[in-house]
Amino acid sequence: YCCHPACGPNFSC
């Protein structure tokens, strides 16, 4: 997953 603002549309926690 990608859990920081820079992930943009890929943001996931």
Swiss-Prot record:
Q: Transmembrane segments in this chain: where? A: none
Q: Which residues carry this modification: Cysteine amide?
A: C13
Where is this gene product found? Secreted
Q: Name one GO molecular function term.
A: acetylcholine receptor inhibitor activity
- Keywords, alphabetical: Acetylcholine receptor inhibiting toxin, Amidation, Disulfide bond, Neurotoxin, Postsynaptic neurotoxin, Secreted, Toxin
Q: What Gene Ontology cellular-component terms does the record carry?
A: extracellular region; host cell postsynaptic membrane
- The protein's superkingdom reads Eukaryota
The UniProt entry, under InterPro entries, shows:
Conotoxin_a-typ_CS
| Domain observations | The cysteine framework is I (CC-C-C). Alpha3/5 pattern.
Similarity-based family: Belongs to the conotoxin A superfamily.
Q: Could you tell me what this protein is called?
A: Alpha-conotoxin OI
User: Could you tell me which species this protein originates from?
Assistant: Conus obscurus
